[in-house]
Amino acid sequence: MENEKLLGHRRDFLKAGALLTGGLLLDQFAFAAGHSGVDDTIKIALIGCGDRGTGAAFQALSTKSNLKLVAMADAFQDRMDKSHKLLSDKFKEKVDVPADRRFIGFDAYKKAIALADVVLLATPPGFRPMHFEEAVDKGKHVFMEKPVAVDAPGIRKVLAAAEVAKKKKLNVVVGLQRRYQTNYRETMKRIQDGAIGDIVGGQVYWNSGGVWVNPRQAQQTEMEYQMRNWYYFNWLCGDHIVEQHVHNIDIANWAKNAYPVSIQGTGSRAWRTGKDYGEIYDNHAVELTYADGAVIYSLCRHFEGTANRVDETFQGTKGRTYLSANNQGILWDRTGKEIFSHPTKGNANPYQTEHDELFAAISKGEYKFWDAERGAKSCLTAIMGRYATYSGQTIKWDEALNANNSLFPDKLAWDANPKVLPDAQGLYPIPTPGKTKVI
């Protein structure tokens, strides 16, 4: 995917966060810890040892902060073994995860979280709400990948935990890394300052050739198959409008400094139609309508052999803008004159920046990041898009937020069944607009 290649004492110290100065300093011991011989190593746990989780750990361990990876958790032994070897080979002095701290299974996350000061949450996103809730309950700082949930009940759980995290002064960074990318920050700062007036419209895109697929293996139970091939099942992924296109939808909300009041649109399965592709669509086209009447058009598709486009453009009352993950950020006035262009060379990797800034704040005893609420609301925006395309209905913000259609299985076990199952031919039921009920 072309625009996504950018790849005891301390716990007690961090828990002393009740003493605040201006809402910023976590505790009175932050300075002393660095000058008194106290072990100020920040212990981190990785929850989800796939490619993205391994990448997140790589970025965390690449920061200048004094970190050590002390625990890992995953559902699958092979993913754990691969991740542990890669990280151990690269960061010999920073990885201390013996076999008894490499936890396997559906409850492995609890054991790993208990041992850390900071947790990295990077499992398939269907598990994110329960993992985030556990981390916050145990008083841990958090980096969690997007999306933070795949359905409305999950969003509500994340929003509730986000409020607790604020009260506990726990730093939370969500992996919507464009928020940490210099061209986006510089361009958005100018937009918020009124450089192109009020945003009245826009277009956001993630059009690409699709992602990996893991075909069914003979020995797999249905639960294992769906978890191995998780991208194609909504309880795990949320469909690509949620799992991937949320990046661009988040930029729409950032540009508007608001969230849509309603969404309508259409989608289908046109290219990915076989049984290996589960239940999700391969294209979505939706309109995000905001309270002031502005409409932003959102398009995402996974079609092989078609033109790729992953970027955002917005129109204001005084001009327009173009942004992309390729470090572009351009503003024009209403006559077409360029008034700002961010240099595309020499920019930091935003995947690294989000970890650099998070761990710098934690190391200094600062409370600076509360991304969870914002991340949850942009994820809800994307979920609304899926609700709209699956049902063919106009979906309003409040009804989406309060929906009770949980996608999560009633039981987590290798011999338990998820809620969506294949027919005798191995094909899964596909949402049909006008018939499918989402709320």
Q: What is each stretch, according to the model?
A:
Residues 1-21:
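N-terminal secretory signal peptides and thylakoid transit peptides that target proteins
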Residues 7, 17, 55, 243, ...:
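C-terminal helical cap and adjacent loop that interface with cofactors, partners, or active-site loops
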Residues 16-92, 252, 437-439:
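N-terminal Rossmann-like dinucleotide-binding module
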Residues 48, 52-53, 167-174, 178-278, ...:
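Predominantly a Rossmann-like dinucleotide-binding segment in NAD(P)-dependent oxidoreductases
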Residues 90-121:
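A structured beta-alpha segment of the ubiquitous adenosine-cofactor-binding alpha/beta core
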Residues 118, 129-180, 194:
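Beta-strand-loop-alpha-helix segment that lines the small-molecule cofactor/substrate pocket
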Residues 123-126:
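N-terminal glycine-rich "phosphate-gripper" loop used for MgATP/nucleotide binding
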